[in-house]
Amino acid sequence: MSDSPERVYPMLLDFVRKETISKNLLRVTLTGEDLIGFPEDQNGSHIKVFFPNQASGILQLPVREGDNVIWPEHKPVPRAYSVRQYRAAVNELDIDFVTHGEETPGGGWALKADIGSQIGLIGPAGPDPLIEPADWHIIAGDLSAVPAISAILEKLPSDAKGYVFIEVDEIEDIHDLVHPEEMAINWLMRNPHDTEPALAKAIKQLPSPEKATSLSAFIAGENQSVINCRKILRNDYQIARDKLYAIPYWKRGKTEEAYHDERHDVMDAVY
C-alpha cells in the first residue's frame, strides 16, 4: 500500500526560481504540498498547466465534482507542457518554457514569475517510454520539444545509437545536451522561405543505419513538420506504427484554442 497522498485536481504549485537555458528557453522550478508523491520516473511526460486568467490576472482552478469539472468565474488558461525533471528529495518540479514575448500565457507567465507566483497542474500523462527500445533511434523536434527530447536522451541506455535533429529560429538557442555518445545531435536553423520543413528534409537525407534490425522514433513540434516527418518515417523507413510516436504541439499561425481539435485529429489519424 502506498503512503503517497491522494492526487489533488489540479495541483496548486508555487514558484521557487528560474534559470535561463538558452535565449528563448527558460526553466521554472516549482514546489508545493500538492506535489508530494509526484512520480520521479516521468521526466518528459505530458502535463497540463493552468495559468492565471488573462483578463483579471487571477488564478482560480477548476474542481472536480464526481465526473464533472466545475470551472471558476475567472477561468484559467490551460496549456500543455512536458515534465523536465522532478526531484522527490526536495519536492521540486522543473518545467522549461519557450519564451517569445510576454503576451503568451505560458512564456509570458514564466518571464514575469517571481516569489508568490502560482500555477495549477494536472499530470503526468502520455506514453511511457516516449521512445520505444530499438537498435537505432530517430528523434526530431523544435525548441518546444527540447524538454521532452532532453529527458528522452537522459533515459536512453549509454550504448544507444541514432540521430537527433532540433530546429531553432535563432542560433542563441543552441545549447549542450546530455546524451549517449552515439546519438548524433544536429541543430538546424529554420529558413522561413523553405517549402519543406527542415526536420523532414534532414530525416529524408539520412543514410540507412547499418546492421539495424529495428528503428524507433520520437517526433514533436510544429504541426506540418510533425506530419511530414511522420509520413517519411512510415513510408520511406517503414518504421512500425508502434515504434513511432509523433505529437504536434502547435501550429504556425493558430492559437492553442483554435488548434485544439485539429491537433487531436492529427494525433488520432491512421498512419
Swiss-Prot record:
The protein's name: Ferric vulnibactin reductase VuuB
Enzyme Commission number(s) of this protein: 1.16.1.7
Record field: catalytic activity: 2 a Fe(II)-siderophore + NAD(+) + H(+) = 2 a Fe(III)-siderophore + NADH
GO-annotated biological processes: cellular response to iron ion starvation
Disruption-associated phenotype: Slightly impaired growth under low iron condition. Double deletion vuuB/iutB mutant secretes vulnibactin as wild-type, but has a significant growth impairment under low iron condition. Triple deletion vuuB/iutB/ics mutant supplemented with aerobactin has a significant growth impairment under low iron condition. Double deletion vuub/ics mutant does not grow under low iron condition, but addition of vulnibactin restores the growth.
GO function terms (MF aspect): ferric-chelate reductase (NADH) activity
One Pfam family linked to the record: FAD_binding_9
Temperature remarks: Optimum temperature is 37 degrees Celsius with Fe(3+)-nitrilotriacetic acid (NTA) as electron acceptor.
Gene3D superfamilies (alphabetical): Nucleotide-binding domain of ferredoxin-NADP reductase (FNR) module, Translation factors
Cofactor(s) recorded in Swiss-Prot or TrEMBL: FAD
Family under the similarity heading: Belongs to the SIP oxidoreductase family.
Domain FAD-binding FR-type intervals: 8-131
GO cellular component: cytoplasm
Tagged with keyword Iron: no
UniProt xrefs under CDD domains: siderophore_interacting
Subunit (UniProt): Monomer.
Subcellular location(s) per record: Cytoplasm
Coiled coil: none
UniProtKB keywords: Cytoplasm, FAD, Flavoprotein, NAD, Oxidoreductase
Induction profile: Expression is up-regulated by low iron concentration condition. Expression is repressed by Fur under iron-repleted condition.
InterPro entries in the cross-refs: FAD-bd_9_SIP, FAD-bd_FR_type, FNR_nucleotide-bd, Riboflavin_synthase-like_b-brl, SIP_C, SIP_fam
Summary of pH dependence: Optimum pH is 7.0 with Fe(3+)-nitrilotriacetic acid (NTA) as electron acceptor.
Job of this protein: Ferric-siderophore reductase involved in iron removal from the siderophores after their transport into the cell. Acts as a major ferric-vulnibactin reductase catalyzing the reduction of Fe(3+)-vulnibactin, a catecholate siderophore synthesized by V.vulnificus. Catalyzes reduction of Fe(3+)-aerobactin, a citrate-hydroxamate siderophore produced by other bacteria, in the absence of IutB. Catalyzes reduction of Fe(3+)-vibriobactin in vitro. No activity with ferrioxamine B or Fe(3+)-enterobactin.
